[in-house]
């Protein structure tokens, strides 16, 4: 079972549908209706932390999930989930130079992990006004994808390789290979 932490975002069920279409059972829980103890009892194969409004400090259980479970359970943070990974690892979250709500960008990547067998670059849809600050990027994270103006679009923890984040929305119809990216995550160790 794949657990999706819902940060009160309208895209959460699009993510759940994509995961279901890839053949996985999905459980969606709101970020204030579950805790780490309950998650451990559920024993999910993987966790996805959804997009949502606000800042990482307003993402309910998301920060606790990352800090408590990243060593044991593969976690993918999407948008706010990605920012939460940056924040909990010591990064600064800042306003993006140009707000990107429903805009597409070319995404360049390292061709590894989530990005295996994806075109480089590919088009992805962005819905955000905050980003992880490259100037204060955590040393225990690696940048794995970026835009042509060097905005961080994905990261991976250097020690807990199962902890990854993506700023863009793989569930959007305008993200060219979002389903394959999710499949790469779901098929990974």
From Swiss-Prot:
The gene is trpG. Its main location: plastid. It catalyses: chorismate + L-glutamine = anthranilate + pyruvate + L-glutamate + H(+). PANTHER family: MULTIFUNCTIONAL TRYPTOPHAN BIOSYNTHESIS PROTEIN, MULTIFUNCTIONAL TRYPTOPHAN BIOSYNTHESIS PROTEIN-RELATED. L-glutamine binds at residues 52-54, 83, 129-130. This is Anthranilate synthase component 2. PROSITE patterns: GATASE_TYPE_1. The lineage of its organism: Eukaryota, Rhodophyta, Bangiophyceae, Bangiales, Bangiaceae. Residues 1-189 form the Glutamine amidotransferase type-1 domain. It comes from Porphyra purpurea.
């Amino acid at each position: 079972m794949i657990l999706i932490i819902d940060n009160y975002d309208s895209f959460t069920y699009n993510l759940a549908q994509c995961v279901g279409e890839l053949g996985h059972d999905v459980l969606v829980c709101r970020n204030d209706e579950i805790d780490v103890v309950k998650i451990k009892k559920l024993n999910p194969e993987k966790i996805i932390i959804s997009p949502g409004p606000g800042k990482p400090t307003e993402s309910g259980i998301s920060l606790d999930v990352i800090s408590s479970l990243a060593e044991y359970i593969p976690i993918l943070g999407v948008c706010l989930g990605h920012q939460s990974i940056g924040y909990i690892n010591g990064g600064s979250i800042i306003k993006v130079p140009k707000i990107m709500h429903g805009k597409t960008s070319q995404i360049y990547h390292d061709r590894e992990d989530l990005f295996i067998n994806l075109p480089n670059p590919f088009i992805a849809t962005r819905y955000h006004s905050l980003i992880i600050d490259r100037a204060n990027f955590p040393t225990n994270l690696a940048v794995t994808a970026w835009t042509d103006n060097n905005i961080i679009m994905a990261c991976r923890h250097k020690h807990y390789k199962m902890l990854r984040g993506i700023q863009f929305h793989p569930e959007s119809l305008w993200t060219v290979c979002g389903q394959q990216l999710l499949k790469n995550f779901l098929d990974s160790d």
